[in-house]
A protein has these predicted regions:
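Amphipathic C-terminal alpha-helical segment
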Residues: 84-87, 105, 127, 147-164, ...
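Helix-turn-helix
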Residues: 4-43, 47
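Hydrophobic alpha-helical connector segments
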Residues: 61-88, 143-146
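All-alpha amphipathic helical-bundle segments outside canonical DNA-binding/catalytic cores
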Residues: 72-75, 112-113, 131-147, 156, ...
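Amphipathic alpha-helical segments used for helix-helix packing
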Residues: 72-76, 87-109
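Short hydrophobic clusters on alpha-helical segments that form packing/core surfaces
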Residues: 1-9, 81, 150
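Amphipathic alpha-helical packing segments from all-alpha helical-bundle domains
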Residues: 57, 105-132, 141-144, 171
Length: 180
C-alpha cells in the first residue's frame, strides 16, 4: 500500500490524489486503510515519506560506502540519477520536492517528515566530507551545497525534460570539492 501510494503522490501530488483512487489502486477497503492509518491520507503520506526516506538514504549510504572519496561517491550518485532519468524517464524514487512544495506550509508533520529526509542526506554527505579531511564547519557548508545542487538539478531535469542540469553539476561539484 505504501509503495503504491508513494508513486501516486509523487506522480500527481498529494492534493490531486483522492482517497478513492488510493483505495482502488491498492485494492483495499476504506476500513483497512483507516485500520492502518487512523488519521487517513495525511498519515499515509507521512508513512510514504518515511519509507522513501529509508530507501533513498540506504541507497546513498551504499554508494558512499562503495567509493573512497566524497568526490567519487557524488559523481556516482549523479551518474545513477542521470541513468535513471535517461532509462526510466523519471526520478520518482529519488525526489519528493513536489510534495514538499505542496504540503510543507500546510502540515507541520509533513514538513517535519520531509525535513528529516533532507537532514539525513546532508548528514551522509557531511560525514563523508569529514572522513575526507574537511573541518566540521566546512563539511556542513559543502554538504548543504551538495544537497541543494543535486536536488535543484533534479527539479530542473524534470521541468526541462533533460539531463543537462545533472550533467552540469556532475562536472562542477567535483571541482568545488577539489577547491576546499
Amino acid at each position: 500500500m505504501i509503495d503504491i501510494a508513494t508513486k501516486l503522490f509523487q506522480q500527481k501530488g498529494y492534493k490531486s490524489v483522492g482517497l478513492n483512487e488510493i483505495l482502488k489502486a491498492c485494492t483495499i477497503s476504506k476500513g483497512a486503510l483507516y485500520h492502518h492509518f487512523p488519521n487517513g491520507k495525511e498519515e499515509l503520506l507521512i508513512a510514504c515519506l518515511q519509507s522513501l526516506n529509508e530507501a533513498i538514504t540506504t541507497d546513498i549510504e551504499s554508494i558512499f560506502h562503495q567509493h573512497e572519496t566524497t568526490q567519487e561517491a557524488t559523481t556516482a550518485i549523479i551518474e545513477k540519477l542521470i541513468t535513471n532519468l535517461e532509462t526510466d524517464g523519471t526520478l520518482s524514487g529519488y525526489t519528493f520536492s513536489s510534495i514538499v512544495s505542496e504540503m510543507a506550509s500546510l502540515s507541520e508533520s509533513v514538513r517535519t517528515a520531509c525535513g528529516s529526509l533532507y537532514e539525513k542526506i546532508q548528514e551522509i554527505y557531511r560525514n563523508k566530507l569529514v572522513a575526507d579531511g574537511f573541518s566540521n564547519e566546512s563539511a556542513s557548508s559543502v554538504s548543504l551545497l551538495m544537497l541543494a545542487s543535486i536536488e535543484g538539478a533534479m527539479m530542473l531535469c524534470l521541468t526541462q525534460k533533460s539531463t543537462d542540469p545533472l550533467k552540469t553539476i556532475a562536472i562542477l561539484l567535483p571541482n568545488v570539492l577539489k577547491s576546499y
